[in-house]
Amino acid sequence: LTPRPATADGPAERLVHPPDRPTRLAPGGTNAVGYTLGLLSDEWNLLILRYAIAGARRYADWRDALPISHAVLTRRLAYLTEMGVFERTPYQGGNRLAYTLTKRGRDLWPVLLTIWAWEAAWVPVHVERLPRMVHRGCGRDFTPVLVCAACGRPVEPRDVAGAFGPSGSWSRSVPAAATRRRSEPTGAAGMFPETMALIGNRWSAAILGAAFLGARRFRDFAQWLGAPPATISARLRTFCELGVFTQEPSPGRPDRHSYRLTKKGRAFFPVAMTALAWGQRWFRAPEGPALVFTHRGCGQDFHGRLACDRCGTPLRGSEVLVESRS
């Protein structure tokens, strides 16, 4: 029996998630990708983290900022604490507890930045204005750019070759429990409406990942993922409606179609890569990494980092100012 990965509705079994060092995963169990999706494919988690990055610490900070029930907020904060993202620290003389981002939690800043940048560029309508991002190093508003850590050049999906590593497989990479969007519909789109359409369901996230790894035909997605055909059809249709995939007739078979990432879909690559990088730093399988990447341009193992599009220098979390817009 392998440990069940934690989800937003329940803690992990038997695994310890230290706030300052990686989780040691069980052999043959859910890998880093599965744990990462279990945590990030939940809109409430992302919203809680968004405000934590901006300075929220007390329960009341999130309660006042979000249309969230007491039960859901309590459950999500407990889950993120269990996963080592928050730690409880006393304040007001020890009578109350604050939720402080740990080293593991603070390390999520690249994921949030790339989500905000993608939503700002490709999604026209948001209930709440996306935050302003300022690079303290050059003093200007910026958009993060994904570059190769080895050579410093910007990369797109076609520039990076990916494959499963020693702990990688589709069965180990999909969270055991279905992930979901908000537990309580508010009647309006969230801060990350299309991000959650892409990764807010375990099969959606898996289909997007398969597309980045080269899946094109319906048969590719079905064979690689093992998802129900109706589920794959529904997700492919949604991705086409969002403009993330384009549907094209297969050569010589006009009755069949292939699915290719559009410019909008390819622009989501930094989100996927920063999320995977965070997961593989903080969830370690004994067999080795779940995914390995090579930069075709320089031939080195690919490890991404974010750079400022205005001055070109690598970004550090301490040099990024996140401000709410009035």
Question: Model-derived features: where do they sit?
Answer:
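DNA-contacting interfaces and partner/effector-binding or oligomerization modules
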Residues: A71, A78, E82-E87, R96-A150
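C-terminal regulatory/oligomerization modules of transcriptional regulators
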Residues: T2-V16, A120-E184, R284-S326
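Basic, amphipathic "hinge/linker" alpha-helix immediately C-terminal to the N-terminal HTH DNA-binding motif
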Residues: S41, Q92-T114, R253-A272
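Short, hydrophobic-biased segments on the C-terminal half of alpha helices
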Residues: L77-A78, L236-R237
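N-terminal helix-turn-helix DNA-binding core of bacterial DNA-binding proteins
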Residues: N31-S69, G190-P228
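Beta-hairpin "wing" of winged helix-turn-helix
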Residues: T81-N95, L242-D255
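Short, Lys/Arg-enriched N-terminal segment that forms or immediately precedes the first helix
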Residues: H17-L37, R172-M196
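Residues in the helix-turn-helix
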Residues: V72, T231
